[in-house]
Design a protein with these regions (language model features):
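Short, isolated positions within intrinsically disordered regulatory regions of eukaryotic proteins
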Residues: 10, 18-21, 45, 132, ...
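N-terminal ordered "arm"
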Residues: 1-39
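Long protein-protein interaction modules used by eukaryotic assembly/scaffold proteins
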Residues: 1, 5, 48-165
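Short, structured protein-protein interaction patches enriched in aromatics and acidic/basic residues
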Residues: 25-60
Length: 165
């Protein structure tokens, strides 16, 4: 989990969701698990207290095979600032992919990395951002454009859709 200015309550929010849901998809341990190719998600979360998180995330694993979500996020103060952060992250998708592949993250290197060409957010993502009502989140897979719109606070069901197990 990386952010320019990680606050205690930010860390609590993410840790609470990840810890609550990380073991929820292991009900039948003897079934054969198939792993899908790496999916990198661009997201925006709107919380009840008016806070917004925008970021990029993917499932990752350490050298001994433990799986965990890797998240890099911003905490913008407005919708225009949210759009700026999303476009910036989308343009740095190759750098994010390299971080996942190499297993090393230096936040300054990420922010200073080269950007790719055009960054396009789906119309559905724009609609979510412009909708000022409600608590929820929007997740767009950056390669194929698949998306998930989730009402309410992040749930274990959403966690498993994004990160599997």
């Amino acid at each position: 989990m990386f952010s320019e200015n990680l606050q205690t309550n930010d860390r609590f929010f993410w840790d609470n969701w990840f810890n609550r849901c990380s073991g929820q998809n292991k009900l039948i341990s003897f079934t054969r698990k198939t792993y899908s190719p790496l999916q990198i998600w661009l997201f925006c979360l709107k919380l009840p207290d008016g806070h917004i998180y925008t970021g990029i995330t993917a499932g990752s694993s350490d050298k001994i095979g433990r799986k965990y979500p890797f998240v890099l996020f911003y905490k913008p103060s407005s919708i225009p600032e949210s759009l700026d952060s999303l476009f910036s992250l989308l343009k740095k998708k190759n750098s994010f992919h390299e971080i996942l592949k190499e297993g090393k993250c230096c936040i300054e290197d990420f922010y200073n990395s080269d950007t790719t060409g055009n960054a396009i957010l789906s119309e559905s993502f724009h609609n979510f951002l412009s909708d000022s009502d409600g608590i929820g989140s929007f997740w767009q897979e950056i390669e194929n454009g698949d998306h998930i719109k989730h009402e309410g606070l992040p749930s274990c069901s959403l966690f498993n859709k994004l990160f599997g197990s």
